[in-house]
Amino acid sequence: MHRQQEVLSVFEIAGITCRVECREEAFWDLLTPRYGEFASDAVPELSLRVEVTDHPPEEVVAHWSGPFARMAGTDGVLSIEGAGFRGIFDERTGEGWLSQPCDRSPFETFLTAIYAGRLLREGGFFLHAAGIMAGNGAHVFF
């Protein structure tokens, strides 16, 4: 296991510890700047295995209709599907997988849905914010 994967294999966000498994160094290179400071030694509550695939052909992306990702949930199982990616997370076991190109967006979209569901079920809340950096400072919108 290379150093970046060791640092990022388990991280904690919003009080929920997640283990991410992926063999592709390029994927870890994408995640390190964003998640490196959240590394944790705690026992993971969730586990997500990521398989990096080739980017979909342009015609697949061009013919994809609808939102970036389609989410569905049935009997404690959350699924995601988009142009060139798909995955499943079983809330009962706390385990899932995601097959996607080397890109943060599918991973982060799926992780956000998993965390949102978990937080809402456990009495937490989910707050979305956006920020803009300008010449006169930073502005955060909730």
Across the structure, where does each feature detected by a protein language model lie?
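A noncatalytic interaction/capping subdomain that flanks phosphate/NTP-handling catalytic cores
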Residues: 1-138, 142
